[in-house]
Design a protein with these regions (language model features):
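Histidine-bearing beta->alpha loop at or near hydrolase active sites
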Residues: 103-114, 119-125
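Acidic catalytic loop of the alpha/beta-hydrolase fold
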Residues: 79-84, 112
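Short beta-strand/loop motif that positions the catalytic acidic residue
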Residues: 69, 74-77, 81
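Short, hydrophobic alpha-helical segments
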Residues: 126-134
Length: 134
């Protein structure tokens, strides 16, 4: 969602829950769960590759594209998410270029990031921003 919103100007509104692939190098320090641990597994076997890994992953990191997002966007994160650490969600949110952005934080929620509570917010958001689309 994030990268597509950044790269496609025709995207008129976006919503991303528990954003993944953000702040790779921070995420590997913040969580010990997979899939991010695959990076640590590789770096333990190839410690000399850390700089190359960081450089390569920057090409795929959503944060690298976030400043190009111009459409309205909402992000929801779970503050106890051990898959996509909330810190990386905060970094993503602060990097988003759109002036119309809102972050929803769900305390007591993990990777589901308040999904069941948040569904109606997403529905209302799209209804507002995609009026007249069929």
């Amino acid at each position: 969602t994030v990268t597509t919103s950044a790269m496609r100007s025709e995207v008129r509104a976006a919503a991303a829950g528990a954003p993944y692939l953000c702040g790779y190098m921070d995420a590997i320090e913040l969580t010990d769960t997979y899939p991010y641990q695959e990076i640590n597994d590789y770096l333990r076997a190839n410690p000399e590759s850390r700089e190359d890994v960081a450089n390569t992953l920057s090409y795929f990191d959503c944060i690298s594209f976030a400043d190009k997002i111009k459409c309205p966007i909402i992000i929801n994160i779970g503050l106890q998410d051990n898959v996509c650490p909330p810190e990386t969600g905060y970094s993503l949110f602060s990097s988003i270029g759109s002036k119309q952005k809102k972050l929803f934080e769900y305390d007591g929620h993990g990777h589901e990031a308040g999904r069941y509570i948040h569904t109606s917010i997403v529905d209302d958001f799209f209804a507002e921003h995609l009026k007249g689309d069929s």
